[in-house]
Amino acid sequence: MSRGQWAPAGELPWERNLFGAESAAVRLKDGRVLIAGGGDERLGPQDGTALFDPRAGAWTAAAPLREARRMHATTLLADGRVLVTGGSGRASGFPVRPLDSAELYDPTKRSWSDGGRMGQARCGHSATLLPDGRVLVAGGTTARSADSERSLASAEVFDPESGLWTPTGSMTDARSLHPAVALPGGGVLVAGGWAATRRDWRTGAGLAYCERYHPSTGRWTVTGGFFAARTGHRLTTLADGTVLATGGGDPDAGTQGRPDPYSRATAERYDPATGTWSREADMPCGRALHQAVRLPTGEVLVMGGTDDTLGEAGYRSTARYDPRFGTWTEGPGMAVGRIDFAAAVLADGRVLVSGGSVRTGPAAPTGSFLRLTRTSELFTA
């Protein structure tokens, strides 16, 4: 019998796809949740922002971004402001039109201000808060030519006090659409992701390579890699400082005669002390483009997602991982299956999921690339 339950949590002011948007939902210091930007049903970049009030259980429209964007990164700063970086400024098409701009949201003023310009325009990158309050932006995708893209190894750091961007050491491997998490002791782990190798992003190479950033030196070092390449996966930091990687798939698998139609059900656990990954029990089913959060109990809740090959329909299913025993149990299903959606843990421990795609491609309505949802749901353990 599954534990916990889902309940409706109002609707966003608009439908939104959040593909490639790192940390799309950010919980503010006052407990509200902010979602900014994203794509419409044709993956056109949007400037709309919204705030969820847990006490009212409702969403309200907030001040729009200064520049419409999708595939961007959203980071909560130590002073309570929110940093939005990069992204793509064009609709679905090839190549992307990456942005170098950044914006800062001040919850007290309820407005956005200029966050300066990065040294490199990028989308599908990671943006991680460092212990000293700065933000590390790494990797992503940019245009290579008029009809091709390339992944980036470069990284840069934003200082909220000065408002300045400075370059830092480059990663060993160029990558985009990769998750990144802060480690105990101040380092940052980036794991897996995607590397552009051809004109079509669907046939890029999935990566098993992982590396760590050291803020004290501004350098990267390679660390243990996954047992299998992953993209569209999630990283979740556990209470003991280890990191759980779940799901994803290898976009190049089909071209190498190794189709992975249902995505990876496998999970791996990273130990920062040894720099190695260990195999964990498989999830009840494979999934990519899902969300995963740590619950107040220490367990990990994995939600939604889709298969890695076509990704035509969002999953309603959820699963819970108990790190004490290394086991998975099936959780209660969401009311709406969703892909590329936002998720955040509220101050009271409930989990909010919002937006995303319900169906894509041939499974979506005629004349639309995506079937989106504006619905939100709350999970109570």
Give the predicted meaning of each segment.
Residues 1-381:
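Kelch-like beta-propeller repeat domains
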